[in-house]
Curated annotation (Swiss-Prot):
Range of residues in the leader sequence: 1-23
SUPFAM superfamilies: Elafin-like
Function: Antibacterial protein. Putative acid-stable proteinase inhibitor.
Disulfide bond sites: 34-62, 41-66, 49-61, 55-70
Residue ranges constituting the WAP domain according to the UniProt record: 27-74
Residue intervals passing through the bilayer: none
Organism: Gorilla gorilla gorilla
InterPro entries (UniProt xref): Elafin-like_sf (IPR036645), WAP_dom (IPR008197), WAP_four-disulfide_core (IPR050514)
Upper classification of the organism: Eukaryota, Metazoa, Chordata, Craniata, Vertebrata
Name the UniProt record assigns to this protein: WAP four-disulfide core domain protein 12
Xref: Pfam families: WAP
BP GO annotations: antibacterial humoral response; innate immune response
Gene: WFDC12
Length: 90
């Protein structure tokens, strides 16, 4: 195997590894649930986060008050909330 073939193989392996690790990292969801959000919005704000991993510490990426933001989660869903609200993530 020539040195150029070896280099192409090593670069390909490195890229596959990086993509695989990034995919695993994004799938991790932090503990707790998003607070109930009963605010009606005419227009959504730009997202401040996309996944829980974008948020520092224990904060989760939740749709709250017209946009995705990093917020402190609640242990249980508050009365009047909808546990399925979390499925609207982009």
């Amino acid at each position: 195997m020539g040195s150029s073939s070896f280099l192409v193989l090593m670069v390909s392996l490195a890229l596959v590894t990086l993509v695989a690790v990034e995919g695993v990292k994004e799938g991790i969801e932090k503990a707790g649930v998003c607070p109930a959000d009963n605010v009606r919005c005419f227009k959504s704000d730009p997202p401040q986060c996309h996944t829980d991993q974008d948020c520092l510490g224990e904060r989760k990426c939740c749709y709250l008050h017209c946009g995705f933001k990093c917020v402190i989660p609640v242990k249980e869903l508050e009365e009047g909330g909808n546990k399925d609200e979390d499925v609207s993530r982009p």
